[in-house]
UniProtKB/Swiss-Prot annotation:
Coiled coil: none annotated. The lineage of its organism: Eukaryota, Fungi, Dikarya, Ascomycota, Taphrinomycotina. GO terms for cellular component: cytoplasm; cytosol; nucleus. CDD domains: GRX_GRXh_1_2_like. The disulfide bond functions as an electron carrier in the glutathione-dependent synthesis of deoxyribonucleotides by the enzyme ribonucleotide reductase. In addition, it is also involved in reducing some disulfides in a coupled system with glutathione reductase. Thioltransferase catalyzes cellular thiol-disulfide transhydrogenation reactions. It transfers reducing equivalents to cytosolic protein and nonprotein disulfides. Belongs to the glutaredoxin family. GO terms for biological process: cellular response to oxidative stress. It comes from Schizosaccharomyces pombe (strain 972 / ATCC 24843). This is Glutaredoxin-1. PANTHER family: GLUTAREDOXIN 2 (PTHR45694), GLUTAREDOXIN-1-RELATED (PTHR45694:SF18). Residues 5-101 form the Glutaredoxin domain. GO terms for molecular function: glutathione disulfide oxidoreductase activity; glutathione peroxidase activity.
Amino acid sequence: MSSVESFVDSAVADNDVVVFAKSYCPYCHATEKVIADKKIKAQVYQIDLMNNGDEIQSYLLKKTGQRTVPNIFIHQKHVGGNSDFQALFKKGELDSLFNTA
């Protein structure tokens, strides 16, 4: 297992909520806003500011089938990107996911 794979897998395993994002991405900002508004403790990684960000993004594609950001995990479960996350929010399903966090 590469160091990037170990980093991503550890981040997902060690945190209830993990978001792999990019600092300039409006969809990432929308996800981060909901998390902040709900006062959820989340680990957010701005991969465009990390030296190995491209490698992380490539591994996320391999792991999840999704290359785009944000790439969101709740309780080690991949929930998708911002559109998936916002759909869960609109349906009122985020609270139950977060409450198990």
